[in-house]
Amino acid sequence: MEPKEKKQKLDTSEVASPSLSKTHLKKKKTKKQKIRKSQEITSPSLSKNTDLVIASPSLSNIDVGEAMKKQNDVAIFLTGIVISSVAKNSNFVFSPASINAALTMVAASSGGEQGEELRSFILSFLKSSSTDELNAIFREIASVVLVDGSKKGGPKIAVVNGMWMDQSLSVNPLSKDLFKNFFSAAFAQVDFRSKAEEVRTEVNAWASSHTNGLIKDLLPRGSVTSLTDRVYGSALYFKGTWEEKYSKSMTKCKPFYLLNGTSVSVPFMSSFEKQYIAAYDGFKVLRLPYRQGRDNTNRNFAMYIYLPDKKGELDDLLERMTSTPGFLDSHNPERRVKVGKFRIPKFKIEFGFEASSAFSDFELDVSFYQKTLIEIDEKGTEAVTFTAFRSAYLGCALVKPIDFVADHPFLFLIREEQTGTVLFAGQIFDPSA
């Protein structure tokens, strides 16, 4: 199938989230020798999901529920540092799950003294106690969250992982087995030393083919060189339909107010049906469930929109989210309420970035190349979500209808609600851009 043109409208929303990064330890400033940027992490995301072979008996001793809760906070933490470094006051979307998966593969395969130090930094960065804990999280996400449900009426989900290693490096049979059987990853030995550009093209083709042609040129020219040792890849694709679709006849153009005091006219979806909305001090949260299908995974997917009450307070809301442990689980609408004015904008954004500066404060020089595409329309969107078990909103059922008009900048997440996995996170400053 030929890749779709970039301007072609998707029949529903389609999200692909690749990312690629060079990773190496940051050396002390006193050392003047040039350090090779030896590892690269690519994180697109689309794949066939098969049962994972678990090689480590110790994984069974991990409290996966507690480990997953920590990853919810890590996802918001990642969102905050990436937005502050590369997407201040602009449309933005990325995949925390892709970054987590790529770093997990790096941590699991890093050997030697330098590898041990790298692994230690990654564990600290992801707030995990061990590589076993990271692997247990990976297993839970792969076996529960990312199972394709399209044949039973649920979301279309696919995930694929890959690793490219220079042919001059020795291959540890255990590491190779780990990638193939645990991470279900493709493994290839390539020639970075004399054919770096060809390998870059190969990785970009891999990312494109596993995201239905939606993600092109993941790795920019010059990102892979003769000094590259490894490239890790993790691709994710999600396509879901709203539990309750919106009527196109009710979609009307209305003003969306920008931070500079002007406005743009964009199409807003609307509905008179009850919605999952909760009001908090200074902001509201809307939960939009996806159709779940008839499988036995007990998964639930949803998009969350976090809307500040005032137009210029999105940064304050993000700061509150990133500094409050358990924020997502404690700010989760649990009941449908009657709505007064209800409007959310249609939007389609594509965002690519290289975010080495985002990690500079953590003594871990990780340069991520990630591209993500998301579209929201009357039929649905692409993303994964987790439904929290409790809500801080303890009021009785609302008597008066509640308004939810997303006509100014807001944050959004897509989560799987059983595990809390944040697949996609972003912000909208101008739906017309």
UniProtKB/Swiss-Prot annotation:
Belongs to the serpin family. InterPro entries: Serpin_CS (IPR023795), Serpin_dom (IPR023796), Serpin_fam (IPR000215), Serpin_sf (IPR036186), Serpin_sf_1 (IPR042178), Serpin_sf_2 (IPR042185). Pfam families: Serpin (PF00079). It comes from Arabidopsis thaliana. It comes from the Eukaryota. The record marks L394, G395 as: Reactive bond. GO terms for cellular component: extracellular space. SMART domains: SERPIN. The reactive center loop (RCL) extends out from the body of the protein and directs binding to the target protease. The protease cleaves the serpin at the reactive site within the RCL, establishing a covalent linkage between the carboxyl group of the serpin reactive site and the serine hydroxyl of the protease. The resulting inactive serpin-protease complex is highly stable. Residues 1-43 are annotated as: Disordered. GO terms for molecular function: serine-type endopeptidase inhibitor activity. Weakly expressed during seedling development. Residues 1-12 have a biased composition (Basic and acidic residues). SUPFAM superfamilies: Serpins. This is Probable non-inhibitory serpin-Z5. Residues 23-36 have a biased composition (Basic residues). Residues 380-404 are annotated as: RCL.
